[in-house]
A protein has these predicted regions:
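C-terminal capping/gating helix-and-loop segments adjacent to ligand/active sites or protein-protein/ligand interfaces
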Residues: 725-803
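Extracytoplasmic/periplasmic substrate-binding proteins
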Residues: 586, 590-677, 698
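Hinge/lid segment of periplasmic solute-binding proteins
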Residues: 457-510, 526-530, 641-648
Length: 811
């Protein structure tokens, strides 16, 4: 199987998501008459605000049904429930639930929370012609629900059947057995009355055996046809199941939605022109209308129109309305400012009067229960909303943990609230760093937010050296529940600037490189010269790193590793003309080639395991990011003992720390105690015990690591341990992970993996410093060396000159 490869930049970044009332100003700010650091005090008070109200529909519930469509009175949901057990006579199941039979059900919930099951609904009857075959199994699911004008329902129901045609003498555990595996996939278009009773049912007239046909989403067009969307096709079916029309799409379909005027809009990317546009379906002609509309590059999921706009969409944490007439989008509000977690938001709907609604909720994996809230957002006069003192906050690409932390703070604090701006909204299709540039420009102009989210691209050391950030050590030392000795000292040391700690960091990851100990030695850390000596032991033509790591990737990685060796924001000193930096340039250019990311395809031959086995690759990347998700078996990959060596560097071990959930406070913040109450959350054991990365608290880390090493074993329905063919207990898998080609099963962390992880953490002292302004200077000038126009020494001098001017201008 072939897979398109990612670009260099993407590859690097991948290495490094009852009622209450909240309000957000129409311009995206809550606004407060209190003077705020980081905001323009003359900014006018908004005329309107958007307020969110929450109705609790489920709490600690076993109901796993998901909302499908909203009406004026409530909403329809679809779930699955166990309805039987098909365990063959005399057969012991291999695992609990192996032969359980499930069927879909439909409920209607009014907005008071009253749930009514559509008792007259009966799943479509299965074709039993193959029911006597070996391993026969059938499953039902409802792919979507729509409400007709008369209140009846249109649903698309899927029936998946599978069995084996293997003769009786072929054993079920043999490889040959699976050559006889057969399956059928059928879709039915059904109309139901309000009780769920069937009005009509028809099998879709489509080649459902093709992988190209599946129901990702469907809507009803003006004629009542069910317009079905898959990622590459649009197919409309009449109520009798016959094909009404099909619209070929040479590209990728992202979303479909009903526009304010009732027509259907289709958001698609044309692969030949790479245009990202909204196309309108002409349901009478069965084609796209001749006019298409330019859409913002981040409008991936359309929301049907109502109120003042033809359609809507959410991008990041912001909600937008889009006008066909002007072909422009207007930001209406931030979900976070309304205390709505957009990561949990589903089935957003806009009514004719402009009221926005949706559902939030989640699954508690410990209690094994579900929660569900109905949220409505309405536009009200700004003065009608109670105001709090505002703390401004800036971030790039607001992840799940940041969003949840801000919402939790705002909901629980009756005096202060955090107003978060996601600067990724300023990125463009041509410049994915525009938001970061804007944020940095504002900060250097004196418009510093009270709280700043820190990631690998944030010029954290520059801000700290300039005195823009608050040292958090005094706050930690004064906090009775926190003790700096509880945290990994090398991680905190890597985050220090001139002895001060300027960010509250909840977690981290380790980026390193691994090689066979017989080749690279058994001691972590090496210089460039030692790297070349090891590479000389490998077969001719062997490359140092994984497939796709060209000179630009290596240059950026090594620069991020040793950035602090070549520049000092505190003194303004630069050392890019040093012999060490010349060696860095030469190291990056060792393969003397650029990788064609646009046309490259990743195959089995290009995996690290295959290339190492064939002597084409000496090292492989090691990314340690969780105590509970250790999938690397490096000894198996190399077929020999390994060393977590790191990248070449002139001193120390070339491992890098990447921060997770890391936040800084402005030194000019007017309400520092309030800001600290937010920041300290990320340093608490209670917060870090649930993170999905390496916690900075050592006690929490050891607890997570110990838990990850506990091996659980599969049991039969009677509670007895199941055994494999060798009579050994079968360990329970913790999940699976893919490298883009192969999929690996993950089990409990082994002692060897735990020791490797502890050693990697202990050896790591350097913070990944992806200072984009400096990286851009270096990569732009290095191009002349890579192309052979200038020597490494000449380019190093040019970089020294430009970087020196820039750094001292920005100090």
């Amino acid at each position: 199987m072939k897979h398109k490869f990612r670009s260099c930049a993407a590859l690097l970044m991948a290495l490094c998501m009852v009622f209450s009332l909240a309000a957000c100003g129409q311009n995206g700010s809550t606004g407060s008459d209190t003077k705020q650091t980081g905001k323009n005090s003359s900014e006018p008070t908004p005329e309107f605000a958007y307020t969110a109200s929450f109705t609790k529909l489920r709490e600690n519930s076993k109901d796993n049904s998901q909302p499908q469509t909203v009406t004026a009175d409530g909403f329809y949901s679809v779930g699955n429930e166990k309805v039987g057990d098909n365990t063959p006579e005399g057969v012991t199941p291999d695992y609990e639930g192996q032969y359980d039979v499930y069927a879909p059900y439909i409920t209607f919930t009014d907005f008071s929370g009253k749930v009514t099951k559509l008792e007259s609904y009966v799943p479509v009857e299965e074709d039993q012609s193959n029911a006597d075959k070996r391993d026969y199994a059938g499953s039902h699911s409802i792919a979507g629900v729509a409400v007709n004008d008369d209140g009846s329902l249109t649903i698309i129901e899927n029936v998946y059947l599978s069995w084996s045609d293997a003769p009786a003498d072929v054993k079920s555990d043999s490889d040959e057995y699976y050559n006889y595996y057969q399956s059928e996939n059928r879709y039915y278009l059904r109309v139901l009355d309000k009780t769920g009773a069937e009005v009509s049912s028809a099998k879709l007239d489509a080649d459902t055996s093709s992988d190209d046909f599946y129901v990702s989403q469907f809507v009803l067009d003006e004629a009542g046809n069910a317009l079905v969307m898959s990622s590459i096709a649009l197919t409309a079916f009449a109520p009798d199941g016959s094909l009404a029309y099909a619209i070929p799409v040479d590209g990728y379909i992202y979303s479909i939605a009903t526009l304010r005027d009732g027509r259907i809009g289709v958001l698609a990317m044309d692969m030949s022109s790479h245009d990202f546009a909204l196309n309108i379906v002409d349901s009478k002609a069965g084609v796209f209308d001749s006019t298409s509309y330019t859409m913002p590059f981040d409008a991936y999921n359309l929301i049907s129109g109502g109120g003042d706009y033809d359609l809507y969409y959410t991008s990041g944490v912001n909600f937008y309305g889009y006008s066909l007439e002007t072909e422009t989008a207007e930001k209406l509000f931030s979900w976070i400012s309304c205390d709505v977690d957009s990561n949990e938001l589903a089935l957003v709907n806009v009514s004719d009067d402009g009221t926005i609604s949706g559902f939030t909720g989640g699954y508690d994996d410990k209690a094994e229960t579900y929660s569900l809230d109905y949220v409505t957002v309405a536009k009200v006069p700004y003065d009608s909303v109670p105001q709090k003192i505002s703390l401004s906050m800036a971030a790039m690409y607001v992840d799940n943990s940041t969003q949840k932390a801000v919402i939790d703070f705002n909901r629980s604090n009756d005096k202060y609230r955090i107003d978060l701006v996601d600067y990724s909204e300023y990125n463009t299709e041509d410049d994915y760093t525009a938001g970061l540039t804007k944020l940095n420009t504002e900060i250097m102009a004196g418009n510093m937010p009270d709280i700043l989210a820190i990631d690998t691209r944030t010029p954290y050391r520059q801000y700290a050296a300039k005195g823009l950030l608050e040292d958090l050590y005094p706050y930690i030392d004064a906090d009775s529940e926190l003790d700096r000795s509880d945290y990994f000292p090398n991680v905190f040391a890597a985050l220090e600037v001139n002895g001060g700690l300027y960010t509250a960091c909840a977690g981290f990851g380790i980026l390193s490189a691994v090689g066979a100990a017989s080749i690279v030695g058994d001691t972590p850390g090496w210089t460039y010269d030692e790297y070349y000596e090891a590479l000389a032991k490998m077969p001719e033509g062997c490359e140092g790193f994984d497939y796709g790591y060209d000179r630009n990737t290596l240059l950026t990685l090594c620069l991020a590793l040793d950035m602090d060796d070549y520049m000092d924001w505190s003194t303004g000193e630069c050392r890019f003309d040093s012999e060490d930096f010349v060696k860095l340039l030469e190291f990056a250019n060792q393969n003397n080639k650029d990788f064609d990311y646009e046309n490259a395809e990743h195959t089995e031959e290009d995996t690290a395991a295959n290339r190492i086995r064939e002597g084409k690759q000496m090292l492989t990347m090691a990314n340690f990011y969780s105590a509970d998700f250790m999938y690397n078996n490096f000894e198996q990959t190399f077929g020999a003992p390994v060393t977590i060596k790191g990248f070449p560097t002139m001193h120390g071990v070339g491992n890098m720390i990447t921060t997770q959930s890391s936040y800084a406070m402005s030194s000019t913040c007017q309400y520092k105690d309030a800001a600290w109450q937010f920041l300290r959350t990320f340093l608490t054991e209670d917060y870090q015990k649930d993170v999905f990365y390496l916690p900075t608290n050592m006690k929490v880390f050891e607890k997570q690591l110990a838990d990850s090493m506990v091996v659980e074993y599969e049991k039969d329905p009677n509670g007895n341990y199941m055994l494999d063919e060798n009579g050994e207990r079968i360990p329970v898998s913790k999940g699976m992970i893919s490298d883009g080609v192969n999929t690996y099963t993950i089990y409990a962390t082994t002692q060897e993996q735990a020791d490797q992880l502890r050693q990697a953490i202990a050896d790591t002292t350097k913070l990944m410093n992806y200072d984009m302004s400096i990286v851009n200077i270096v990569t732009e000038q290095a191009a002349a060396y890579f192309s052979g126009q200038k020597s490494a020494e000449e380019v190093a001098k040019l970089i020294q000159s430009k970087a020196n001017i820039y750094i001292n201008e920005q100090r």
